[in-house]
Amino acid sequence: HVQQVRLLERDLQTLVPALDEEGLPERLRIALNADSLATWWAEAVGEFCAQQHLLLDLVVEDQTVGLKRMRAGEVAACVCASERPVAGARSVLLGAMRYRALASPAFIARHFPEGVRAELLSRTPALVFGPDDFLQHRYLASLGGDGGFEHHLCPSSEGFIRLTEAGLGWGLVPELQVREQLERGVLVELLPDKPIDVPLYWHHWRNGGQLLGLLTDQLVRSSRQWLVPLA
């Protein structure tokens, strides 16, 4: 894999500086889900990238399918919901992203005039990130639903929230991303006692070199500030 070779070459250049004739910054290609990119990722890696003179080539994939990029050898690492690593890689649990079912007050008044009930959710328009996003399906199944539901597709974390605020549908939104909207009452939680947690794992190549190892240590430490710990 090209990424692995480059990372090992970087380690050699660190030991023998004369080999690093160009002195260019290293670049890592990493796959991660859009919600991580929109919330905790930047703060988790910002200072590290500056210190290590590291450039990132980020590839956005749903957390359920990001591992396919590792399997194809296209990325050096990925953040995804799958625990089992591909051959030649390791995975480490970072924590869980907590999602809450939210809607605008106007949407709730229009679709739930007598109060929100779990069995009614599948009969109202929802918002789904993309064709690989089955989080709403899992959520409805946990409430006893077993069929399809009407939904909009919105492949943007920021746009997802804007559409929810505009009353187009209800959606499962990262708690990290909407604390201000919840405080202001712009968005309201439909079922306050029923969040859904999505575990996030960091996958990286075993022979990824020192830089990837340092980045792994940084993510394990810093992710605790934002993600929900899992037993």
Predicted regions and their residues:
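Alpha-helical "hinge/linker" immediately C-terminal to small N-terminal DNA-binding modules
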Residues: 1-21
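Short amphipathic alpha-helical coupling segments at ligand-binding clamshell hinges
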Residues: 1-4, 40, 207-222
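Immediate post-signal peptide segment of exported/extracytoplasmic ligand-binding proteins
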Residues: 9, 20-28, 119-123
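Central regulatory/effector-binding core of bacterial HTH transcription factors
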Residues: 17, 23-87
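Beta->alpha turn/N-cap motifs
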Residues: 62-63, 80-85, 104-105, 156, ...
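C-terminal regulatory
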Residues: 71, 90-168, 180-197, 224-231
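Paired acidic/hydrophobic, glycine-rich loop segments that form the ligand-binding mouth/hinge
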Residues: 76-81, 169-173, 190
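A short beta-strand structural signal in non-transmembrane regions
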Residues: 200-204
